[in-house]
Amino acid sequence: MPTILRVGPYRFFFYSGDMEEAIHVHIERDDKIAKVWLDPIRLHSSGGFSRSEISKILKIIESKREAMMEAWNDYFGN
């Protein structure tokens, strides 16, 4: 479960078994976990986050998308 970024209370990561799916990240804070596709950026599941938090998370992803995609490709060898 590689962590690729931490911003404030949020941890951005993917699971080692995720390579069969389209490129995405999971976002965790406390007991909440959301999932966001990266190409294009699109919310898959909100995981209990509020709309305002999802908005913040999506803005973070927009600003770090390239680095997240690079981390995915480096890890999975794409």
Model regions: which residues?
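A short, structured beta-strand/loop element
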Residues: Y15-F49
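C-terminal structural segments of small proteins and small subunits
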Residues: F49-N78
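Negatively charged, low-complexity tracts enriched in Asp/Glu with abundant Ser/Thr
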Residues: M1-Y10
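Detector for methionine-enriched segments
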Residues: M1, M19, M68-M69
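Generic preference for hydrophobic/aromatic residues in regular secondary structure cores
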Residues: I4, L43-S45, K64
